[in-house]
Amino acid sequence: MKAVLLVVAALFLAGSQARHFWQQDDPKTSWDVVKEFANKYVDAVKESGKGYVEQLDASSLGQQLNLRLSDNWDTLSTILTKLQADFGLATQEFWDTLEKETEWLKQIVSEDLQDVKHKVQPYLENFQKKVQEEVEHYREKVRPLGIELRDGARQKLQELQEKLTPLGEDLRDRTREHVDVLRTQLAPFSEEMRQRLAKRLEELKDSATLADYHAKASEHLKMLGEKAKPALEDLRQGLLPVLENLKASILSSIDQASKQLAAQ
């Protein structure tokens, strides 16, 4: 299972080659994608949390208990931002180490992908050429019908539609044939790529790299937890005033309710 995870990690880190197989633009790095997602998530939590706090303060229950949660929200938001920054630095260090440790596997998989791409390219180009020929052939058949429509106006619209229908069906059927041919041609290469990945996985299982990586990954995860502790403690300390205020408000309301019942 650890070997599978390592291969998946390498493939993810090699995503700049695999996901952008046919693109020329420089893709985002793996860490940039993770960091962007995390930042958006934390920002969304802070914004939605602030809205919920304001709604709770404005509610009849909030006013009755005198919660005043909004007074502490800015402090909590600051602590959460600090937690986000501290955790991000520790996570980036772990991610950079993971990328460095799997560079060799990423390079091998990238070479395999490029090799298969080189073999598949002629079939893709031939498929594109065939489809373009079919479309051009269809245009040649349709062109005189368009001229006929302009000359015959509305009364021939139905007749034109009847003539176009079989032409469109013919184009669809011929394109399907080319797709089936392409699928048959590419099937061996798909199997070849599967076998190559299986071979890399077996090589990885038999190497000492996996055990070494597991030890390093465990060490970095432990370091990540240690670095996150101070920020989590700050968050806990920031929550204490809110919880104490909430507790005091609830106890005060219970005490008032008890006095009212006793007075009756």
UniProtKB/Swiss-Prot annotation:
Keywords: Cholesterol metabolism, Glycoprotein, HDL, Lipid metabolism, Lipid transport, Lipoprotein, Oxidation, Palmitate, Phosphoprotein, Repeat, Secreted, Signal, Steroid metabolism, Sterol metabolism, Transport. It is found in: Secreted. Pfam families: Apolipoprotein. SUPFAM superfamilies: Apolipoprotein A-I. Residues 1-18 form the signal peptide. The keyword Signal applies. Belongs to the apolipoprotein A1/A4/E family. This is Apolipoprotein A-I. It comes from Cavia porcellus.
